[in-house]
Amino acid sequence: PLFNSCDFISRVLQSCINQTLKDIEILIIDDKSKDNSLNMVLEFAKKDPRIKIFQNEENLGTFASRNLGVLHSSSDFIMFLDSDDFLTPDACEIAFKEMKKGFDLLCFDAFVHRVKTKQFYRFKQDEVFNQKEFLDFLSKQRHFCWSVWAKCFRKDMILKIFEKVKIDERLSYGEDVLFCYIYFMFCEKIAVFKTCIYHYEFNPNGRYENKNQEILNQNYQDKKKSNEIIKRLSREFLFDEFHQKLFEVLEREEKSLCMRANKI
């Protein structure tokens, strides 16, 4: 998804163009950007036919934009990339090689660039799980692995998500949790790797760190909506122990967002 990212878009596109695996699609979903980022992408697209640009008729938010990107894709495997982040050069090659082994989902580690560069998840070792084992693994992690970045998904399984939730649901916060939650419920074979394939750039003006009152209020409303959808869908899946732990985390996050929105 692309929205007002002119400060970062050249770097992220260059990281895609320079992938060691050349047979890839680079899909850009412009969510009504108001800066020069779309024009910058158009210049890149003139030089690389793998770059395909789609423009939303109105601002739809991150969740809907990603979903529309999936529908426009022709690949069996999908990776998501935020416009202020970037990939390691071999990210697609590593993911493609592993997905060909029959996995439903790959989870990788990522570098986080803040004051210092650190590994985000810090997985101790490479592991393969069935669904129950993976949900147990998630429950014990410091971070629940909810981000859609640093993962590789199967397109046919993503389409199952669209049977459970509106494709154009307007969400720009809490959307990763909703997407991954539904996807995890369909997974049977999952691999976790300690290899870092993704660079997450700390952006003080980004959605998650922004202190603007209007954005904070919208973040809270989006998170609340996401949690409500997850709780409604949870009745369809029989993982009571996992859901109990999950709801504790989600409610804590929602309460924290509410406090941030009311504090400023």
What are these language model-derived features?
Residues 147, 171-172, 192, 196-264:
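C-terminal subregions of glycosyltransferases and related glycan-biosynthesis enzymes
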Residues 62, 83-191, 198-217:
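Donor-binding/catalytic cores of nucleotide-activated saccharide
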Residues 30-40, 58:
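A conserved acidic beta->alpha catalytic loop
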Residues 56-73:
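Glycine-rich, basic loop-to-helix element that forms the pyrophosphate-binding segment
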Residues 17-28, 36, 48-52:
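Short loop->beta transition adjacent to catalytic acidic/histidine clusters or analogous donor-positioning motifs
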Residues 16, 31-32, 60, 83:
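Conserved short acidic donor-positioning loop in nucleotide-sugar-dependent glycosyltransferases
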Residues 78:
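Short aromatic/hydrophobic "clamp" motif used to bind/position activated sugar donors
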Residues 4-18:
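Short, well-formed alpha-helical segments that are part of the catalytic scaffolds
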